[in-house]
Design a protein with these regions (language model features):
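Conserved beta-strand scaffold positions in the cores of enzyme catalytic domains, especially
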Residues: 4-9, 34, 88-89, 220, ...
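Short His-Asn-centered micro-motif
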Residues: 37-38, 60-62, 371
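Metal-dependent phosphoesterase core characteristic of DEDDh/y 3'-5' exonuclease domains
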Residues: 1-31, 49-172
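Metal-dependent phosphoesterase signature
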Residues: 26-45
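CheY-like receiver
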Residues: 44-47, 51, 244
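Extreme N-terminal flexible tails
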Residues: 146-150, 157, 171-212
Length: 946
């Protein structure tokens, strides 16, 4: 009737294994405690059999798990038992799930309750010491007996007489109380043993301490750093990373973002820029007989990969282990690129993943650091067992030999201390070198709170939610030690393991500095045999491409101009010579090819925009449809012989046909050679305020009010970095008043001030990634031979991990394929006119002097006309009342930031309301068409030449 007949507690001695630290944290039983106070397993199994022989049922919470474990142990020890023959009464069933009614079960059902949840449902209170074995048994017993009292079991289940429940209720008229078992505090007992062991280990460490001078003279550099490209996980910008390295006089630094290499090019570029400045300053200092100002920095490109069991298996969530890989040289970098690409294109499942087979395939010229607590060796020490951790270590050592290092960290955490002790033992046993790292996510310790806000933004959490695991908790770093520490701070942390500091320079010395910038590589373009030149095969020349380009250009010129005058010939020869000297004939051939094919597919192609309209070669190839000679457009704006840079042609297609042109390019060059370009969505000033406010639980109204104080397109960094005088020059009076309100808020000590000041740190953080609207990359071979790639949600194409600001410097050919709705409208209109009126219209030959069209512009009726349909432009059209095509061209050029202020003068001069003046009489030749106002870049260039 609910009475305790017998109760026994036993600790079992671990044999051939150790109890992982994470299991010890939950149950309080350490390996040392179990070895000291435990009994052999065989003895405990015999005692369990004695109890089972007296029992009618096996009762428990989720007891199937216990049956499997104990059944295996009986089998392993070759002991017979009644355990699996007895009927089971489980307190964790679909029936108790219906009682507790907790949402979140499979198939829309209620979830099975945990022991704590069931206890809370039955008694209105949680029970203390969950996961203490004695407390668990007592709570399970209480729940089981209460379920009997409430008649939640049938007489058939309990195998009792019909009057049993009446008698049980009489014996227990009130809810069941705890039976009063004595709880052994195993955590305290384990902690006491650990304290004794730690004192012994400290004595041993002091005895083995190496020469202090070796530690003092050792170079320390940070080999484990995350930048803002570890999206929403780090507040460190690339610029900050390099600046912090320089600030602490370190001679190298590594970039090891989570599973991607988005920041690699920016990183090398920033370091190169720093080194250039330092070199100049040091040379200047030496000339003056002064001490050099600083050290040059060696950039170490790395990546912290998620290495799982099978990166192709997407049937279950497997994040794998976090392992740091560093490139020793350019070939190692190329292998990182391959792995980072595979992680996204093949292995992405919740996170980008690779596996050990991928690592084996691309392991050449790679250095491996074993990683943080989520690294394979460390994680297995904590969660699985030291034997399995050793097996993992052996695999990595077999693969990478002396390029494999055990990474130890000191963030003032007990779990790290436990791991480090084992790692040191492994290092001695397997002759693997230790390296000391700090897992850096922010630059300064005071940035820890801002970083925590960033993690909350990532997970959509409030900062007030406690950090921990499970329902009602959120992710967060355990303390504020994850910052870019100085050499002195790191040496102090690792004074008991000085070799971990000394070994770092060995890693740095293994790395060769290399350049990522390169000349643009064009895909091979097939030309007719009669134009091929055998010498090109020997020296990689472009004689054949130049000859073929000249041929098709002059053929096109005959069709465009009929008679090729001396002026046309000179212009063509000048442009072709410039194209030959800059090495870009292939570029024009590639563009001409897909534009011609677009027209063959009945895709509308725009007449041309931007500087490409200044090329007569482009006009003769039908790349553009505007005659540069007619409009005095200069080729030098497009391709300057004195400044060699990649030509840039923006090509408009009707938005419905753009996809077909893309398909043609993919089919021609191969899907593995064509990619779109990634974009990084960053936290702008206003969004950083709103995100921070949400996390801090600042009311939405207040967050919106503060955000509106920031002038459009302004940055918090610039506002707070400017003095009063500079601010007056930056903003108009009404905006300046708002800015001053913002500054006053930041000076306060309330939640609003905290929001603004934290938002300043978060501003500029990468929040998400997207796809460039029109940029397309074409490479000579597999794109992963050049840059890392990823995949995008709405596209089957690869996406470069490098963004638009660096793809060209990285040697990639970039084309802009613009989908223009206006072209689709024109195309549809032509079809409608044909269908309704049987009139054939050719948009390429519409007259540009049609009076009725000008009347539409004069009335401002320009809806649907590309770049003329905004309300502001419509107003100016009404005032201008254009009469010639030059008026429309000029207004298009003027209607943008900067030149806008000249629009009133332009309109007044056209109508004779303002006198047209020229600073010099010679200027009239070039400025007459724009009423004496310099509107176009061509005008500036022509005037400077004159």
């Amino acid at each position: 009737m609910g009475n305790c007949i017998e109760h026994q507690d036993y600790l079992i001695q671990p044999k051939g294994f150790n109890i992982p630290y994470d299991a010890e944290k939950i149950h309080g039983i350490s390996t040392e405690l179990a070895q000291e106070q435990g009994l052999p397993l065989v003895e405990v199994l015999e005692k369990l059999n004695e109890a089972l022989n007296k029992s009618k049922f096996v009762v428990g919470q989720n007891v199937g798990f216990d049956l499997n474990i104990m059944g295996c142990e009986f089998f392993r020890e070759e002991k017979s038992t009644k355990l699996l023959e007895l009927p089971i009464l489980d307190t964790c069933t679909e029936h108790t799930a219906e009682l507790c009614k907790l949402p979140g079960g499979r198939g829309g059902k209620f979830k099975l309750p945990t022991l704590t949840e069931l206890h809370e449902y039955l008694f209105g209170e949680a029970f203390n010491e969950a996961h203490n074995a004695t407390a668990d048994v007592e709570a399970t017993t209480r729940c089981f007996l209460e379920l009997i009292r409430r008649k939640q079991y049938t007489k058939e289940q309990l195998d009792v007489q019909p009057d049993y429940f009446v008698n049980f209720s009489k014996a227990n008229p009130k809810e069941i109380q705890l039976i009063g078992l004595k709880h052994i505090n195993l955590q305290k007992a384990s902690a006491k043993i650990h304290e004794q062991l730690q004192q012994t280990q400290e004595i041993e460490n002091i005895e083995s301490f190496v020469d202090v001078s070796e530690l003092e003279n050792a170079n320390f550099v940070h080999l484990h750093n995350h930048s803002q490209f570890s999206v929403l996980q780090s507040t460190i910008s690339i610029k900050d990373l390099v600046a912090s390295t320089a600030k602490h006089n370190m001679n190298a630094v590594a970039l090891t973002d989570h599973a991607n290499m988005m920041g690699a090019f920016h990183f090398v570029k920033e370091v190169k820029n720093h080194n250039r400045i330092i070199k100049e300053q040091n040379e200047e200092a030496l000339e003056k007989g002064e001490v050099p100002v600083g050290e040059e920095i060696k950039p170490i490109i790395g990546c912290e990969f998620f290495v799982c069991e099978d990166h192709l298996n997407k049937s279950h969530k497997d994040y794998g282990y976090q392992i740091v890989l560093l490139a020793k040289n350019k070939n190692g970098y190329q292998n990182l690129v391959k792995m980072a690409s595979i992680a996204y294109t093949d292995g992405f499942y919740y996170v980008p993943r690779i596996d050990k087979k991928v690592v084996e395939q691309y392991k050449d010229d790679i250095i491996v650091l074993s990683g943080n607590l989520y690294g394979e060796v460390s994680s297995k020490i904590l969660n699985v067992g030291e034997k399995q951790a050793e097996e993992a270590l052996v695999w990595w050592q077999d693969q990478f030999k002396d390029d494999f290092y055990l990474e130890i960290m000191q963030h003032n955490q007990e779990d790290e201390r436990r791991v480090n002790q084992v790692l040191k033992e492994f290092a001695n046993k397997y002759d693997v070198k230790l390296v000391a790292t700090n897992n850096n996510y922010y630059c300064e310790q005071e940035d820890a709170n801002a970083h925590d806000i960033l993690l909350c933004v990532k997970d959509g959490e409030k900062q007030g939610t406690p950090i921990g695991r499970g329902r009602g908790y959120r992710y967060g770093l355990p303390n504020q030690e994850y910052f870019f520490k100085s050499s002195e701070e790191m040496k102090a942390l690792f004074k008991d393991t000085p070799e971990a500091i000394v070994n770092i320079q060995e890693v740095v010395d293994k790395v060769e500095a290399f350049e990522l910038a390169r000349d643009v590589l064009l895909p091979e373009f097939g030309i007719p045999d009669e134009f091929k030149d055998e010498q090109d095969l020997e020296d990689g020349g472009k004689r054949g491409e130049n000859a073929y380009l000249r041929h098709i250009t002059y053929e096109g010129a005959k069709k465009r101009y009929g008679e090729i005058t001396k002026e046309i010939e000179e212009r063509l020869d000048f442009e072709l010579a410039t194209i030959e000297n800059t090495g870009y004939p292939g570029y024009f051939l590639i563009v001409e090819d897909f534009i011609r094919e677009a027209r063959n597919m009945d895709v509308s192609v725009g007449p041309g925009r931007g500087s490409a309209a200044g090329s007569v070669v482009a006009y003769c190839l039908w790349i553009t449809n505007i005659d540069p000679l007619k409009y005095d457009l200069l080729f030098e704006r497009f391709l300057n012989p004195d400044r060699v840079s990649m030509p840039d042609i923006d090509i408009d297609f009707d938005d419905e046909g753009r996809g077909r042109v893309m398909d043609y390019v993919i089919n021609k060059y191969g899907a593995n050679q064509v990619a779109q370009i990634i974009t990084y969505g960053t936290m702008a000033a206003k969004s950083s305020i709103r995100d921070t406010a949400r996390v801090l639980d600042l009311p939405l109204f207040d967050a919106d009010r503060i955000a509106k104080l920031i002038p459009t397109m302004s940055k918090l960094g610039k506002i707070f970095g400017a003095d009063e005088k500079k601010l007056k020059g930056m903003f108009r009076a009404e905006d300046l008043e708002k800015v001053n309100q913002l500054l006053n808020i930041a000076d306060g000590e309330d939640l609003e001030a905290e929001t603004v000041n934290l938002a300043r740190i978060l501003e500029g953080s990468v929040r998400n990634t997207g796809i460039h609207a029109c940029g397309v990359i074409i490479t000579p071979s597999d794109i992963t031979n050049y840059v890392p790639v990823a995949t995008a949600k709405d596209s089957d194409l690869y996406v470069t991990q490098f963004d638009n600001s660096v793809v060209e410097d990285a040697g990639l050919l970039k084309m802009d394929f613009l989908g223009l709705k206006t072209l689709t409208l024109i195309k549809d209109t032509v079809k409608i006119v044909k269908a309704k009126h049987n009139v054939d219209l050719d948009p390429d030959n519409f007259p540009i002097d049609d009076e009725k069209t000008y009347e539409l512009f004069q009335r401002g009726e320009t809806v649907g006309i590309f770049q003329y349909e905004s309300p502001g432009m419509q107003k100016h059209m009404k005032d201008l009342k254009p009469t010639v095509f030059d008026d429309l061209i000029a207004m298009n050029a003027l209607y943008r930031p900067g030149p806008m202020e000249y629009i009133p003068s332009f309109i007044a001069r056209k109508h004779g309301d303002e006198e047209i003046e020229y600073d010099l009489p010679e200027m009239e030749e070039y400025l007459k068409e724009t009423y004496g106002i310099t509107v176009y870049q061509e005008q500036v260039m022509l005037l400077s030449q004159k």
